[in-house]
Swiss-Prot record:
Cell compartments where the protein resides: Plastid, Chloroplast
Family indicated by similarity: Belongs to the universal ribosomal protein uL23 family.
Entry GO CC: chloroplast; ribonucleoprotein complex; ribosome
Subunit text: Part of the 50S ribosomal subunit.
Swiss-Prot/TrEMBL GO biological process terms: translation
UniProt lineage: Eukaryota, Viridiplantae, Streptophyta, Embryophyta, Tracheophyta
Protein name per its UniProtKB record: Large ribosomal subunit protein uL23cz/uL23cy
Length: 89
């Protein structure tokens, strides 16, 4: 699981769990197919859609820092990630 940094727990991500969508911060150099295969292999689920966006970097004296992007992963109906649901509840 080199590419996935951690699961995101925000108000929006909590609302998306009811729609069977989970939010993760991932390495910016990882591809969509790598992230999809890691999620399917590690959690044992089927991914049907993935949306991603880069978060704005923080301003520093010597430039920007941006080391990750956010992925919203939609699972097939009937699948869920129980470890994240237990974390949220």
């Amino acid at each position: 699981m080199d590419g996935i940094k951690y699961a995101v727990v925000t108000d929006k991500s909590l609302r998306l769990v009811s729609k069977n969508q989970y939010t993760f911060n991932v390495e910016s150099g990882s591809t969509r197919t790598e992230i999809k295969s890691w999620v399917e292999l590690f959690f044992g689920v089927k991914v049907i859609a993935m949306n991603s966006h880069r978060l704005p970097g923080k301003r520093r004296r010597m430039g920007h820092t941006m080391h990750y992007r956010r992925m919203i992963i939609t699972l097939q109906p009937g699948y869920s990630i129980p470890s994240l649901i237990n974390l949220i509840i």
